[in-house]
């Protein structure tokens, strides 16, 4: 079936002017995730912030109770004992100057990046490469740390980094279409709770303004914010 026809069919029965309770929205999304692959379930949260102002930036990391259903490749910048610790914890790529050089040459063979504090003077050179990809290690989200084992296992076990985009939206994958409705609801509520806890001091008015869920190939379904935050 052509993509256009599939999406048109998937949109049938979805009232794009209506706000659905979260559980109903998830059910609708799962019913319409009919691709041959296991589609990712995504959530978009519109916030009442302007991230161009430093005091309205929203970012953080949350451990989803049911994981993401995705296996991340984790890269760690570390030396000596910490490098060995990273390997033992299951990191896919570990290095120091050698790994910095690879990344500078465009060879980024990982999805999540962790660094020990002593490596940051070196890793700082990679800002132009890792920054636009949202992969720059940051102590605020636990990716610059001496607890290499915890960071690697967290990344492998279902932690999700979130960051508000220019339009004031946070987007994140929260599981797969094969997950049960209950597990997806739990994951979305965990993400929403973390976003609320990360509310910046400069935020004014209604913080969580709109919420929508979708699958990789399916339509978006608008959600009643109150059912996500409850």
Swiss-Prot record:
GO cellular component, one term: cytosolic large ribosomal subunit
NCBIfam families referenced in this protein's UniProt entry, alphabetically: rplA_bact
SUPFAM superfamilies named among the record's database cross-references: Ribosomal protein L1
Function: Binds directly to 23S rRNA. The L1 stalk is quite mobile in the ribosome, and is involved in E site tRNA release.
Gene Ontology annotations of biological process type: regulation of translation; translation
Gene Ontology MF terms: rRNA binding; structural constituent of ribosome; tRNA binding
Pfam family, one: Ribosomal_L1
Family recorded in the similarity comment: Belongs to the universal ribosomal protein uL1 family.
Record bears the keyword Disulfide bond: no
Oligomeric and partner information: Part of the 50S ribosomal subunit.
Disulphides: none
Listed name of the protein: Large ribosomal subunit protein uL1
Keywords: Repressor, Ribonucleoprotein, Ribosomal protein, RNA-binding, rRNA-binding, Translation regulation, tRNA-binding
């Amino acid at each position: 079936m052509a993509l256009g026809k599939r999406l048109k069919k998937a949109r049938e029965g979805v009232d794009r002017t209506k706000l659905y309770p979260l559980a109903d929205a998830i059910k609708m999304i799962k019913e319409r995730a009919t691709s041959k692959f296991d589609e990712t379930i995504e959530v978009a949260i519109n916030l009442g912030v302007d991230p161009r102002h430093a005091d309205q930036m929203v970012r953080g990391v949350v451990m989803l109770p049911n994981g993401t259903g995705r296996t991340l490749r984790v890269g760690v910048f570390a030396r000596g004992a910490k490098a060995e610790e990273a390997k033992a914890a299951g990191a896919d790529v570990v290095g120091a100057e050698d790994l910095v050089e690879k990344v500078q040459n465009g060879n980024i063979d990982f999805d999540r990046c962790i660094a020990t504090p002593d490596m940051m003077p070196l890793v700082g050179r990679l800002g132009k490469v890792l920054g636009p990809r949202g992969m720059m290690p940051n102590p605020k989200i636990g990716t610059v740390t001496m607890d290499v084992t915890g960071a690697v296992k967290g990344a492998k076990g279902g932690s999700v980094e979130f960051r508000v985009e220019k339009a004031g939206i946070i987007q994140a994958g929260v599981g797969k279409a094969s997950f049960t409705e209950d597990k997806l609801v739990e994951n979305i509520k965990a993400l929403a709770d973390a976003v609320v806890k990360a509310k910046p001091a400069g935020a004014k008015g209604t913080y969580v303004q709109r919420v929508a869920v979708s699958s990789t190939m399916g339509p978006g379904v608008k959600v009643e914010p109150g059912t996500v935050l409850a």
